[in-house]
Amino acid sequence: MVETGHHHQHPPAPAAAGHPPVPSMAMARNMGTTWPPAEQLHHLQYCIHSNPSWHETVVLAFQHYIVMLGTTVLIANTLVSPMGGDPGDKARVIQTILFMSGINTLLQTLIGTRLPTVMGVSFAYVLPVLSIIRDYNNGQFDSEKQRFRHTMRTVQGSLIISSFVNIIIGYGQAWGNLIRIFSPIIVVPVVSVVSLGLFLRGFPLLANCVEIGLPMLILLIITQQYLKHAFSRISMILERYALLVCLAIIWAFAAILTVSGAYNNVSTATKQSCRTDRAFLMSSAPWIRIPYPFQWGTPIFKASHVFGMFGAAIVASAESTGVFFAASRLAGATAPPAHVVSRSIGLQGIGVLLEGIFGSITGNTASVENVGLLGLTRIGSRRVVQVSTFFMIFFSIFGKFGAFFASIPLPIFAGVYCILLGIVVAVGISFIQFTDTNSMRNMYVIGVSLFLSLSIAQYFLANTSRAGYGPVRTAGGWFNDILNTIFASAPLVATILATILDNTLEARHASDDARGIPWWKPFQHRNGDGRNDEFYSMPLRINELMPTRFL
């Protein structure tokens, strides 16, 4: 890989009257080495358009599939049972999610951002779905199976209509216009909070079965970071494939605990978190089944639930935006231009439309965990992620095989997520290097946006009941769903706060250099930087076939 970063180092400003003098460069050198800003991260082994060998690509792609599987199973566990679904319904929902994730990921890497991002499930849709479940949980159905299907049909209808929010703001360039008033000051909290806001998927989920979750976390750190230095001959293998090796070891350990009867006399919640013999999932999954349109029946369109989904669509757009910026750093690409982010949000809307048609349980968003995997392995190849879509689609069709891997206990995934999500946080913080890190104004914008976004989102989540009732409780249920969904999302709150503060707080007096605008501006226009086409142009002469707004 070739480093192409531009390194800028400005001379120190003269000291103002009444202020202590700025240390000279000689004094700074005596204090130790300083590192100039670098557009690309060091030590990446493969960038966005460089590829490992095919056998390495296949193994790395399977690793991406395993990482996204955890959140897929988690959201199915969260929503299917409250809907009235049985283990067979859960297996079919997981198959549908995997199938659509494969389709949407392939579309995004081909004609979306073209970054190596996996498009997985979005938890932003959980609150609106819980609202639908609540409305149908009043004994009006003859059986739980009937209630499940009716709920899924309503979710389908709501997803289909709400998808046009993403399509309109994306292909209508409204989202691109928002990105154009961004600066690195705004990107720092947006990217960092995309990961920090998922802290419940880390140690709290791990602690549900600490005897397998904690060993997974510790073993992965030791194997991937320490042993590679002790065993230099296999250091590359440990760095790239330690996740699969450690997961297999801890999964086998969990199976031994299960078979030995360690969980025979524990609570039901502990059994669900720790045991590996989820026979209900294996036995209920069909050998071969291809998800098809309207598999649950004709979609039901209900205005109150459709409006509730609108908020989730906006939240998912903010989540994906933060993930795209993180992926660009970890793939060795320049920051995605505004028109690229906008078209990807529009394509994300098309993905939600397809998910509504095929009967998925939520909309999609860019997977934070899989972007963290780019940093863990130091491989940002687009081809690896594209090949991973084969595994998603294959295991969605051959259900028994998919159910086998879906039986991995969630605390094992949580141990992995503790590391992957932490990497994305650090990537978000790295954007601060392009700004004046000694500016109190910049510190104020970043600090307040970070803290308040997490604090507000945590308040809304902590005060939301299992039935989906949030802190906003007016007479309009659809209005409640929109506000509760928006403010329960740390990334969207961070986007709102940072954008307002950075563009209004001393905006006329703060220099563009201090805000990082000279570095940022070339990436916000189609022809602003010559490398934009290198990373983000469409393949196979698609540019000549599609209208400009779709490019």
UniProtKB/Swiss-Prot annotation:
The chain crosses the membrane at residues 56-76, 92-111, 117-136, 158-178, 179-199, 202-222, 242-262, 306-326, 390-410, 412-432, 442-462, 481-501. Residues 1-30 are annotated as: Disordered. Its main location: membrane. GO terms for biological process: adenine import across plasma membrane; guanine import across plasma membrane; hypoxanthine transport; uracil import across plasma membrane. The keyword Methyltransferase does not apply. It is found in: Membrane. Expressed in the apical meristem 4 days after imbibition (DAI). Expressed in the major veins of rosette leaves and pedicels. Expressed in the root central cylinder, root meristems, root tips and lateral root primordia. GO terms for molecular function: adenine transmembrane transporter activity; guanine transmembrane transporter activity; solute:monoatomic cation symporter activity; uracil transmembrane transporter activity. Belongs to the nucleobase:cation symporter-2 (NCS2) (TC 2.A.40) family. This is Nucleobase-ascorbate transporter 3. The gene is NAT3.
